C-alpha cells in the first residue's frame, strides 16, 4: 500500500511537502500498514557544521528510547518512522557544547491533526558553539566565583553575552557563532591582573587563549573604643609567603615607633583606620597573613586587642573578625573666620557653659584636663556668629575640629533727599537680604529712625533691596541702586548705601518733508492724571524734545498726526535707574485703507509716472492699512489667483476712502505627465448646471511650446538678418548664413491646463489619449475659494507595457504564467512558440508582475540579469529495489531521499520497488528505515546527472521480532489505552519496549531481540484506571519468529468514596438538624444535604474518589433567640474508600425551663419488659415499639407543661429536678439494657430514639458486666 508520495523540484525554490504516512490498526499483519506516521525535518545552520555528529532521538513521555537516527550529511534532513500513536518527545543530541533551538519537541501523535500527520517540518536550528575558560587567583590553580565575564566581538565595545564564574573560577558562553572574540572580566572590588583574553571560534567548541587572573581580594575590618569608632589606628600586615610586589593599594613605608616582636614575619605594608573605625587592604593575593594593630596618641601608645591576628585569603573578599578594641589628655583647637581661613583673635570659647578661654592672635586655644566624654563648645565675637558644637572628645582627638564662623554682619544706610509731594514722609523702611546661592533664602529687617540697618548672613553671594511702599513707588520714589549686590566671605560688610534717583527723557522727530506743527506728549502709565506735553514747530525735517525731572516709572510718549504713517506712533519707556534718551519718531508715508475678500498682491502706478510701478504690496484678507510713500492719484491693479469685479481701481491720497475688492472666480491648475509625447485631451465637467463642459486640447506639452517659441525666435532673427542684408547690399550677401538649432524633445512631457472656478464648485477632470493609460483615469476637485486652489490635478500617463522572453535552449509549449505581484490568481497564461519565445502585452506599467514557467519533465530557472528569460533542464530519476535476505520483495520499508531543498519519504509496496522521478541534477542522500530490520547499505550519498536514471538495490536483514496480544476485562470487553511493556530479563535486562492498546484492545510490542526472555506486563505509569492484571505478567522467550496470543485480563479501579457519620445529641433536636456537604473551595453552596429525621446516623450518596478537599457542616433550625449552640464541622480529603465522622451538638436554653419527671411513667414498663424479655421476646418487640411511642408522647407533654409554667417556678425547681430525673432514668435504662438478651443492632435502633438513650448508650454497654 502506497502511503506517501514524493514530488520532483520544479525549481530550486520549490520544496515538496513532507510525506504523511497514515495508517491503520495493530494486528498480526506485517506490512506497511503498521506505520502510523513519519516525523521529519531539518537540522539547520547558517554556518558550516558536521551534520554526521548529530543524532535525533525519539522518547516516550516516560523517557524510554523508541528510535534514533542520524542526519543527512549534505543538508541535515532526518526522518523517524512511528508505529504507535501517543505522546512522544523528540530530542536533538549534538556534541557537548553545541546549541540548538529548540532542544526538544513534544509530540501528540493522533494520526489526524498533529504536525507529523499534517506533513509539517520539525526543524532544529543551530545557534552556536560553546566557549570555555577560567578566572584564576594569582599563583593558584583555582579561582573565585562571582566574577563578571563578558564576550564581545574583537574591535567592538558592544557586549554579546555576560556570565559569572562558578566556584573554582570556571565560566562558559553558549550559542557563539564562528568568529574572533574578546573576553573581558570585571569585578567591583577585586583587582584584576589579566582582565582580558581572546578566543577564535571556527567549526567546534573553543577555549579561551589564556586564563584571566585576579591579582587580589579586598580585606577589611574595624576598630572601636568604648563602642565608638576609632580613627588613625595603624594596621601592619605581615606574611611569610607573599611579597610586597603582590600587594596593591597599601602603604609600604615603615611605621615610626613600631618594634616587631616576631622576626620570622616579613613586613609588607600598613593601612590606617578611617573616621568610621574601618580599615581595609585593597588587594591581597590568596595566602596566609598576620595583621598587628599599632596606635600611638600625641604622647602615649595605646594597647589594642587582639594584639595579633592571623587570617587566610582564599578566593573571595574577607571581613576580619573580631573587631579590634583600643583599651586604655589637654586638647587644642582653633577659631577661624572660614574654612581654611584666618584665625579669629579675642574670641571667647565656652566649654559646657562653664570653662571660658580666649583665643590667641592666630585664633588658637587650649583646653586642659579633659577626660573622655561629650562636650558642648561655643565661640563668641562681635559681628561674627558661630554655631554651638557638640563633640565627642577621646584620646584619638588631641586636636579638636576647627570652630568656623557661620555668619557675619551686613550693615548699611538709606539716604532720601526729598519725598514726593503726594505721600507722607516715613521714618522706617523694610530692607530685604536675599541669597543668590541655591537656597534663595530671604531675611527682612527694619531700619532705625536714621535709616541704618544690619543683617546676619552666612558666607555667600547676596543682594540687598529696600522695600519701598507701593504708594511711594507710584509717586516716583526710587532708590539707587535698586539692588545692592555683595559677597560675604570671611568678614563683616559695613558699607551698604542707597540714595534717591530722578531722571530726564529726550528724543527727536524725523519727517519726510517739512514737519510744521507737532505735539509730543509724555503720560505716566502708573500714575493717573500725570501728563506733560511739548508743542514742536519748525520748517525743518527734524526736531528734538526733552522732558526734565522725571520720576521713575513707566511712561507712554506719543506724537499726534493721524493722516501720516509713522514708524512708531507711540513708544513706551520705563525710567528705572538711568536717564532715557534716543527716543525717535519717524514719518514713513501717507495712510491708505482697503478691504479684501482674499489675500492678494496689489500693484500701484502713480499718474505722471507712466507705467512705472511705484509699489507692490502683499495683503491679507480683511481690512489692510498701508502707506504710500508719495501723495497723488494711484492706479491699483490686483495680481492673484483670483478674479475680481474690476480689472483695476483708482485711489487719490487727497480724498481718502476705503477700497473694497471682492473675488468672483479662482484659478485651478492641472498637469498631465507622460513618458511619451502623444495626443492628450482634457474634459472638465462642472457641478454647476449653468457651466457647460469644457474640452481642452489636444494639448501641447511644455516641451513643444518651448520648441515653438525657439523656432519663432529663430525665424524672427532670420527675417531681421534678411532685412539688414537687403539694406547692406552685395557686401552682406557674401557672408554665409548663420545656422541655429532648436532643443531636442526629451521626456517626460508635461501638459499644463487651467480653469477659472467659482467658490464651492466641484469639477471632474478626465484625460483621454489613443495610446496612453492614465493614473488615475479621472480626478475630482472641490474649489472652496478660501485660498488659491493651486495645482489640484496631477495625472500621469504611461504607455502600455509588453513582457517578452525566451527559453534557452529553444523549447516549445512551455507554460508562461503572468501574475500581478501579490495576487492569488494568474493574470495571463500563454505558451512559448516553436522558437521558445513569447510576448504578453500591453499591461499597466505601474504594476509589478511575476513571470513563472513550467513544463512536465523539466526544471526551468530564471536567467540571471534578465526579466522573463529561462533556462530549461531535463529532470533525472532514481529507482530503488528493496529485498529481504531471502531475495523476496520487502514491503513497508520507509525510504527517505533528500538533496538540496528536495526531500521525499515513500513506503515500498508489495513489489519492494520505489521510483523517484523529476529530480534535478545534484547530490542526494537516501536512508531506508523499518523497525526490526537493518539494511545494506544503511545510507548513502549518490550523484544524479541531468537526464540520468539510476537503479539501486537495497537488502534488508531481520534483527528483531514482535509480540502480539490483547487486553480485555473479565467479561471479555476490549480495554483501549492500556500501556503495555516488554521488560528484558537476565542478560537482556537493559532492553525494553512499550506500546498502548488500540480500540480493540490489541497491542504489538516491536523490536524484541532473539534469544531474550521478556516479561509482558502493564506499565507502572499511565494505567491509573487499572487496579490489577491477571496474570501480573506473561513470560515470553523470543526465537526467530513473532509471538502471538499473549492475552491479559485487567480489573478497573473502583472510583467510589463512601461517606457516613453520626450525631451525638438529644433526640428532641434531631428534627431540627441537617448535615451539609461542601467542597472546600466553595463554602457558599452545598453539593449535598441530608436530614436526620429521627435517626442519629446519616449516609451521603457515593462521592468520586478524586482526592479533593471537602467540609461536612451540621446545621440547625433551632432559634438563636432561645438557644445557644455551636455548629460543628469536619474537613476531610476523598482518599481511600470510606470515611465515618462524628458530630456533637449540645445546645443550651437561654432561660432554664422546668421538666416534668418522667421516671414514674417508664419504671413499670421497663420492669415488665425485663421480666418477660427472656420468655416472650417474640411478642415483646411490638410492645416495645408501642412503649417507645408513648414515652415520646409523655416527653412532649412534659415539655408543654414546662412551657406553661411560670418563669419563677422554673428558676427555683429546674436544676434540682433535672438532676434527680437524669440519675434515675440512667439507672433504669442500664438495668433494662443489660437484661435484654437481644441487645444488638435492633436494640440500638429501638433505644436510640428515646430522649435519654443517645447520651448513655455507649456508657451502659461498658457497665453491663456488673449485672
From Swiss-Prot:
GO terms for molecular function: carbohydrate binding; ribosome binding. InterPro entries: Carb-bd-like_fold, CarboxyPept-like_regulatory, Ig-like_fold, NOMO-like_N, NOMO1-3_2nd, NOMO1-like_9th, NOMO_12th, NOMO_3rd. GO terms for biological process: multi-pass transmembrane protein insertion into ER membrane. Residues 32-1155 are lumenal. Glycans are attached at residues 50, 218, 618. Highly expressed in pancreas and skeletal muscle and, at lower levels, in heart. The keyword Disulfide bond does not apply. It is found in: Endoplasmic reticulum membrane. The chain crosses the membrane at residues 1156-1176. Keywords: Endoplasmic reticulum, Glycoprotein, Membrane, Signal, Transmembrane, Transmembrane helix. Residues 1177-1267 are cytoplasmic. Residues 1198-1219 are annotated as: Disordered. The keyword Lipid biosynthesis does not apply. Residues 1-31 form the signal peptide. It is a single-pass type I membrane protein. One of its GO terms (cellular component) is protein-containing complex. Component of the multi-pass translocon (MPT) complex that mediates insertion of multi-pass membrane proteins into the lipid bilayer of membranes. The MPT complex takes over after the SEC61 complex: following membrane insertion of the first few transmembrane segments of proteins by the SEC61 complex, the MPT complex occludes the lateral gate of the SEC61 complex to promote insertion of subsequent transmembrane regions. Component of the back of Sec61 (BOS) complex, composed of NCLN/Nicalin, NOMO (NOMO1, NOMO2 or NOMO3) and TMEM147. The BOS complex is part of the multi-pass translocon (MPT) complex, composed of three subcomplexes, the GEL complex (composed of RAB5IF/OPTI and TMCO1), the BOS complex (composed of NCLN/Nicalin, NOMO and TMEM147) and the PAT complex (composed of WDR83OS/Asterix and CCDC47). The MPT complex associates with the SEC61 complex. Due to the strong similarity between NOMO1, NOMO2 and NOMO3, similar interaction pattern probably occur for the three gene copies. This is BOS complex subunit NOMO2. The gene is NOMO2.
Amino acid at each position: 500500500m502506497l502511503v506517501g508520495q514524493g514530488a520532483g523540484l520544479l525549481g530550486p525554490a520549490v520544496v515538496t511537502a513532507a510525506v504523511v504516512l497514515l495508517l491503520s490498526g495493530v494486528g498480526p499483519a506485517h506490512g506497511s500498514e503498521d506505520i502510523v506516521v513519519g516525523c521529519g525535518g531539518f537540522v539547520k545552520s547558517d554556518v558550516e557544521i558536521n551534520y554526521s555528529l548529530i543524532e535525533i532521538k525519539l522518547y516516550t513521555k516516560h523517557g524510554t528510547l523508541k528510535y534514533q537516527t542520524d542526519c543527512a550529511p549534505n543538508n541535515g534532513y532526518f526522518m523517524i518512522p512511528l508505529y504507535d500513536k501517543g505522546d512522544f518527545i523528540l530530542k536533538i543530541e549534538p556534541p557537548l557544547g553545541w546549541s540548538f533551538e529548540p532542544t526538544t519537541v513534544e509530540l501528540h501523535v493522533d494520526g489526524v491533526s498533529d504536525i507529523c500527520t499534517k506533513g509539517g517540518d520539525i526543524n532544529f536550528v543551530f545557534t552556536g558553539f560553546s566557549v570555555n575558560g577560567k578566572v584564576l587567583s594569582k599563583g593558584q590553580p583555582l579561582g573565585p566565583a562571582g566574577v563578571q565575564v563578558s564576550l564581545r566581538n574583537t574591535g567592538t565595545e558592544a557586549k554579546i553575552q555576560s556570565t559569572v564564574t562558578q566556584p573554582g573560577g570556571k565560566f562558559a558562553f553558549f550559542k557563539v557563532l564562528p568568529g574572533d572574540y574578546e573576553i573581558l572580566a570585571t569585578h567591583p572590588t577585586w583587582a584584576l591582573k589579566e582582565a582580558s583574553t581572546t578566543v577564535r571560534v571556527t567549526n567546534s567548541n573553543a577555549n579561551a587563549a589564556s586564563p584571566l587572573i585576579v591579582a587580589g581580594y579586598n580585606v577589611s575590618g574595624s576598630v572601636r573604643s568604648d563602642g565608638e569608632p576609632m580613627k588613625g589606628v595603624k594596621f601592619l600586615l605581615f606574611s611569610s609567603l607573599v611579597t610586597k610586589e603582590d600587594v596593591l593599594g597599601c602603604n609600604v613605608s615603615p611605621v615610626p615607633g613600631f618594634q616587631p616582636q616576631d622576626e620570622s614575619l616579613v613586613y609588607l605594608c600598613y593601612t590606617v583606620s578611617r573616621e568610621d573605625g574601618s580599615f581595609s587592604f585593597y588587594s591581597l593575593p590568596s595566602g596566609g597573613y598576620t595583621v598587628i594593630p599599632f596606635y600611638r596618641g600625641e604622647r602615649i601608645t595605646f594597647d589594642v586587642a587582639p594584639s595579633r591576628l592571623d587570617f587566610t585569603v582564599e578566593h573571595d573578599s574577607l571581613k576580619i573578625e573580631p573587631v579590634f578594641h583600643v583599651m586604655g589628655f589637654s586638647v587644642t583647637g582653633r577659631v577661624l573666620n572660614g574654612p581654611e581661613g584666618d584665625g579669629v583673635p579675642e574670641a571667647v570659647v565656652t566649654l559646657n557653659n562653664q570653662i571660658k578661654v580666649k583665643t590667641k592672635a592666630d585664633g588658637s586655644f587650649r583646653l586642659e584636663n579633659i577626660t573622655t566624654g561629650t562636650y558642648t563648645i561655643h565661640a563668641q565675637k562681635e559681628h561674627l556668629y558661630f554655631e554651638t558644637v557638640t563633640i565627642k572628645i577621646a584620646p584619638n582627638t588631641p586636636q579638636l575640629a576647627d570652630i568656623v564662623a557661620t555668619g557675619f554682619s551686613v550693615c548699611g544706610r538709606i539716604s532720601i533727599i526729598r519725598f514726593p509731594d503726594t505721600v507722607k514722609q516715613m521714618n522706617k523702611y523694610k530692607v530685604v537680604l536675599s541669597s543668590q546661592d541655591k537656597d534663595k533664602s530671604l531675611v527682612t529687617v527694619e531700619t532705625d529712625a536714621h535709616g541704618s540697618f544690619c543683617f546676619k548672613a552666612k558666607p555667600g553671594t547676596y543682594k540687598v533691596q529696600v522695600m519701598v511702599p507701593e504708594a511711594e513707588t507710584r509717586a516716583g520714589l526710587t532708590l539707587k541702586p535698586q539692588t545692592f549686590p555683595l559677597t560675604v566671605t570671611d568678614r563683616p560688610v559695613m558699607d551698604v548705601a542707597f540714595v534717591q534717583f530722578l531722571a530726564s527723557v529726550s528724543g527727536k522727530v524725523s519727517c519726510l518733508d517739512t514737519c510744521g506743527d507737532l505735539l509730543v506728549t509724555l503720560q505716566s502709565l502708573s500714575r493717573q492724571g500725570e501728563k506733560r506735553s511739548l508743542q514742536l514747530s519748525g520748517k525743518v525735517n527734524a526736531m528734538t524734545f526733552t522732558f526734565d525731572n522725571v520720576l521713575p516709572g513707566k511712561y507712554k510718549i506719543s506724537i499726534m498726526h493721524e493722516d501720516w504713517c509713522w514708524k512708531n506712533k507711540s513708544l513706551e519707556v520705563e525710567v528705572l535707574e538711568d536717564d532715557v534718551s534716543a527716543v525717535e519718531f519717524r514719518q514713513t508715508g501717507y495712510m491708505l485703507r482697503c478691504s479684501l475678500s482674499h489675500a492678494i498682491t496689489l500693484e500701484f502706478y502713480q499718474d505722471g509716472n507712466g507705467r512705472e510701478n511705484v509699489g507692490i504690496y502683499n495683503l491679507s484678507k480683511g481690512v489692510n492699512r498701508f502707506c504710500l510713500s508719495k501723495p497723488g492719484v494711484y492706479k491699483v491693479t490686483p495680481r492673484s489667483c483670483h478674479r475680481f469685479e474690476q480689472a483695476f481701481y483708482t485711489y487719490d491720497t487727497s480724498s481718502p476712502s476705503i477700497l473694497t475688492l471682492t473675488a468672483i472666480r479662482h484659478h485651478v491648475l492641472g498637469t498631465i505627465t507622460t513618458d511619451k509625447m502623444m495626443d492628450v485631451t482634457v474634459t472638465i465637467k462642472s457641478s454647476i448646471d449653468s457651466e457647460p463642459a469644457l474640452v481642452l486640447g489636444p494639448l501641447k506639452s511644455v516641451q513643444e511650446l518651448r520648441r515653438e517659441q525657439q523656432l519663432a525666435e529663430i525665424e524672427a532673427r532670420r527675417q531681421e538678418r534678411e532685412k539688414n542684408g537687403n539694406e547692406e547690399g552685395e557686401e552682406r550677401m557674401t557672408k554665409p548664413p548663420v545656422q541655429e538649432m532648436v532643443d531636442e524633445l526629451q521626456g517626460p512631457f508635461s501638459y499644463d491646463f487651467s480653469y477659472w472656478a467659482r467658490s464651492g464648485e466641484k469639477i471632474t477632470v478626465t484625460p483621454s489619449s489613443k495610446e496612453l493609460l492614465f493614473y488615475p483615469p479621472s480626478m475630482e476637485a472641490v474649489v472652496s475659494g478660501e485660498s488659491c486652489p493651486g495645482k489640484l490635478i496631477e495625472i500621469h500617463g504611461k504607455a502600455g507595457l509588453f513582457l517578452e522572453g525566451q527559453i534557452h535552449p529553444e523549447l516549445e509549449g512551455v507554460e508562461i504564467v503572468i501574475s500581478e505581484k501579490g495576487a492569488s490568481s494568474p493574470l495571463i497564461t500563454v505558451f512559448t512558440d516553436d522558437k521558445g519565445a513569447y510576448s504578453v502585452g500591453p499591461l499597466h506599467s505601474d504594476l509589478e508582475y511575476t513571470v513563472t514557467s513550467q513544463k512536465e519533465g523539466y526544471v526551468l530557472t530564471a536567467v540571471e540579469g534578465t526579466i522573463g528569460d529561462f533556462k530549461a533542464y531535463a529532470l533525472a530519476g532514481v529507482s530503488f529495489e528493496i529485498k529481504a535476505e531471502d531475495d523476496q520483495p520487502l514491503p513497508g520499508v520507509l525510504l527517505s531521499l533528500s538533496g538540496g531543498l528536495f526531500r521525499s519519504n515513500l513506503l515500498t509496496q508489495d513489489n519492494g520497488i520505489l521510483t523517484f522521478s523529476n529530480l534535478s541534477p545534484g547530490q542526494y542522500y537516501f536512508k531506508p528505515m523499518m523497525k526490526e530490520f537493518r539494511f545494506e547499505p544503511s545510507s548513502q550519498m549518490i550523484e544524479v546527472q541531468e537526464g540520468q536514471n539510476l537503479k539501486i538495490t537495497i537488502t534488508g536483514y531481520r534483527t528483531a521480532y514482535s509480540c502480539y496480544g490483547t487486553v480485555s476485562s473479565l467479561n471479555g470487553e476490549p480495554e483501549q489505552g492500556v500501556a503495555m511493556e516488554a521488560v528484558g530479563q537476565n542478560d537482556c535486562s537493559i532492553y525494553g519496549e512499550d506500546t498502548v492498546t488500540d480500540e480493540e484492545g490489541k497491542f504489538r510490542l516491536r523490536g524484541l531481540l532473539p534469544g531474550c526472555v521478556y516479561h509482558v506486563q502493564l506499565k507502572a505509569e499511565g494505567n491509573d484506571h487499572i487496579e490489577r492484571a491477571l496474570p501480573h505478567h506473561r513470560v515470553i522467550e523470543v526465537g526467530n519468529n513473532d509471538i502471538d496470543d499473549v492475552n491479559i485480563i485487567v480489573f478497573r479501579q473502583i472510583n467510589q468514596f463512601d461517606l457516613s457519620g453520626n450525631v451525638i445529641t438529644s433526640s428532641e433536636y434531631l428534627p431540627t438538624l441537617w448535615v451539609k456537604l461542601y467542597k472546600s473551595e466553595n463554602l457558599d453552596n452545598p453539593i449535598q444535604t441530608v436530614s436526620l429525621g429521627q435517626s442519629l446516623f446519616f449516609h451521603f450518596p457515593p462521592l468520586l474518589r478524586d482526592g479533593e478537599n471537602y467540609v461536612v457542616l451540621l446545621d440547625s433550625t433551632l432559634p438563636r433567640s432561645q438557644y445557644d449552640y455551636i455548629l460543628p464541622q469536619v474537613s476531610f480529603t476523598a482518599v481511600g474508600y470510606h470515611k465515618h465522622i462524628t458530630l456533637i451538638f449540645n445546645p443550651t436554653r437561654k432561660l432554664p425551663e422546668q421538666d416534668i419527671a418522667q421516671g414514674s411513667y417508664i419504671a413499670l414498663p421497663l420492669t415488665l419488659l425485663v421480666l418477660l424479655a427472656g420468655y416472650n421476646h417474640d411478642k415483646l418487640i411490638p410492645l416495645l415499639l408501642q412503649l417507645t411511642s408513648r414515652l415520646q408522647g409523655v416527653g412532649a407533654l412534659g415539655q408543654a407543661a414546662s412551657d406553661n409554667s411560670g418563669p419563677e417556678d422554673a428558676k427555683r425547681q429546674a436544676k434540682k429536678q433535672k438532676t434527680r430525673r437524669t440519675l434515675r432514668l440512667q439507672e433504669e435504662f442500664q438495668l433494662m439494657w443489660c437484661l435484654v438478651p437481644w441487645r444488638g443492632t435492633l436494640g440500638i435502633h429501638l433505644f436510640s430514639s428515646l430522649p435519654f438513650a443517645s447520651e448513655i448508650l455507649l456508657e451502659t454497654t461498658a457497665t453491663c458486666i456488673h449485672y
